[in-house]
Swiss-Prot record:
Any single GO CC term annotated in Swiss-Prot or TrEMBL for this entry: large ribosomal subunit
Single biological process term from Gene Ontology: cytoplasmic translation
Family matches, as PANTHER family: LARGE RIBOSOMAL SUBUNIT PROTEIN UL2M (PTHR13691:SF5), RIBOSOMAL PROTEIN L2 (PTHR13691)
Protein name stated in the entry: Large ribosomal subunit protein uL2
Annotated source species: Mycolicibacterium paratuberculosis (strain ATCC BAA-968 / K-10)
Top-level division of the source organism's lineage: Bacteria
Function summary: One of the primary rRNA binding proteins. Required for association of the 30S and 50S subunits to form the 70S ribosome, for tRNA binding and peptide bond formation. It has been suggested to have peptidyltransferase activity; this is somewhat controversial. Makes several contacts with the 16S rRNA in the 70S ribosome.
InterPro entries named in the record: NA-bd_OB-fold, Rib_uL2_dom2, Ribosomal_uL2, Ribosomal_uL2_bac/org-type, Ribosomal_uL2_C, Ribosomal_uL2_CS, Ribosomal_uL2_dom3, Ribosomal_uL2_RNA-bd_dom
NCBIfam families according to UniProt: rplB_bact
Amino acid sequence: MAIRKYKPTSPGRRGASVSDFSEVTRSTPEKSLVRPLHGHGGRNAHGRITTRHKGGGHKRAYRVIDFRRNDKDGVNAKVAHIEYDPNRTANIALLHFLDGEKRYIIAPQGLSQGDVVESGPNADIKPGNNLPLRNIPAGTVIHAVELRPGGGAKLALSAGSSIQLLGKEGSYASLRMPSGEIRRVDVRCRATVGEVGNAEQANINWGKAGRMRWKGKRPSVRGVVMNPVDHPHGGGEGKTSGGRHPVSPWGKPEGRTRHPNKASNKLIVRRRRTGKKHGR
């Protein structure tokens, strides 16, 4: 994928860029793999905002992605198309299996139309193939990794992300996450070889607020410019620093978002670096 820069014909176009979608081979999705998607604007069933800064945006249809890939072992599939997916940063690949079934997967870097992919313990180590961690050599770059056997891919799904398999010991494999964290995962968990494609997506300059609104993202207002009734940092005469350490709108200190007593914490070998405050 390459980035195409706009000419500065207006303030919103100056510096803005967009993907050239050179990897995408089809514009309309596979009808049998599309489901309706209803936006909720960050509201729950009572109509109250539970997730701020969401709402509006272009109408989308959900593409059903196969995150498990555990029921087609030994059945080869041909990459029919690389498609755009409005619901994620990565592109998706439409697979045509030899038995006639069609499925979507996350498109890895280097996968192109006409390639053949497979899944199962005996699959080759090449981008797009899906195997259990016990069958993948140490040092391999992988993505779409499960946290529990058969639970479906949970890790490294966004554009350009990848995980490195450092080694295996007993029933666990050690993985280096995109954050730098080193974590142990059951060797029965599956992963797909290669890194997620569309890595240049991170370099797109959106140019104007309106393009964010098309994506369903609303403005994020700083607490220091609010009134005291709306935020702990609000109020004061003139510009103020907030008068206290940074907190959320509900008074919780910023940072430290992880649950301290999570059962899976014992599988973390080395924590991610989180800066001077919390990285000690």
